[in-house]
Design a protein with these regions (language model features):
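Iron-sulfur (Fe-S) cluster-binding segments and ferredoxin-like electron-carrier domains
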Residues: 43-74, 99-123, 135-151
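Residue-level signal for pocket-adjacent positions within structured domains
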Residues: 8, 24, 31, 51, ...
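Cofactor-binding beta-sheet edge motifs in enzyme active sites
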Residues: 1-15, 30, 127, 135-137, ...
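Short Fe-S-cluster ligation motifs
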Residues: 65-93, 121-143, 156-173
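Short, structural beta-strand-to-alpha-helix junction motif
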Residues: 17-22, 59
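Immediate flanking context of iron-sulfur cluster ligation sites
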Residues: 21-42, 49, 73-96, 111-130
């Protein structure tokens, strides 16, 4: 039996299992994606006592006494900074890897509010993206850090799409859902959705 905290709520788990399976199957928290189940892809990245950790390699027994945070448990200003930043730079394509990238980036920014490009690359080294390359993701994390430092403001006109047109940048209509891990993929659909 193990007791720990998930997004501030105390939970007790009777059976030893992978933390990712507990999050997804028992708590129906789908922002931690199951891309490999063996710690290779980073789509399940969460925070454990503030550090970016892959949920598929941590067991519930090893989580005992720890503070676990998923995308849902990030502070609202952090969530909004990443939604804006990833949307503004076009860092989201299919979106499957993005919640893990957000968690890796958020852990880095909490540790160093002004990360360099090299630090960002190092922070996401264990996170695989098959769509965007990494350039826009790195730019997105850098912009999120600038927003959180107060150096850049969220451009609500850009986010709302008030000024779309030929030759102008546009947010994907699903960027918020994909950044926050709310986008549904086949493995995210369970009996609660039926």
């Amino acid at each position: 039996m193990a007791t720990f905290y998930i997004n501030g709520a105390e939970v007790t788990v009777a059976k030893k299992q992978k933390l990712l399976r507990y999050l997804r199957d028992d708590l129906h928290i789908h922002s931690a994606k199951d891309g490999c189940s063996e710690g290779a892809c980073g789509t399940c990245t969460i925070h454990v006592d503030g550090a970016a950790v892959k949920a598929c390699v941590l067991t519930t027994a090893l989580a005992a006494g720890r503070n676990i945070v998923t995308v849902e448990g990030l502070p609202e200003d952090v969530r909004e900074a990443f939604v804006y930043a990833f949307g503004a730079v076009g860092a989201v394509q299919c979106g499957f890897c993005i919640p893990g990238m957000v968690m890796a980036g958020a852990a880095l920014i909490a540790e160093d509010p002004e990360p360099t490009e090299e630090q960002i690359k190092y922070a996401i080294r264990g996170n695989v993206c098959r769509c965007t390359g990494y350039k826009k993701i790195i730019e997105g994390i850098s912009l999120a850090a600038a927003v959180l430092r107060g150096e850049k403001q969220i451009d609500e006109d850009l986010e709302r799409g008030d000024d779309y047109g030929v030759g102008k940048r546009a947010f994907r209509i699903d960027v918020r859902k994909k950044v926050l891990g709310e986008g549904k993929y086949p493995d995210d659909i369970d009996e609660l959705d039926q």
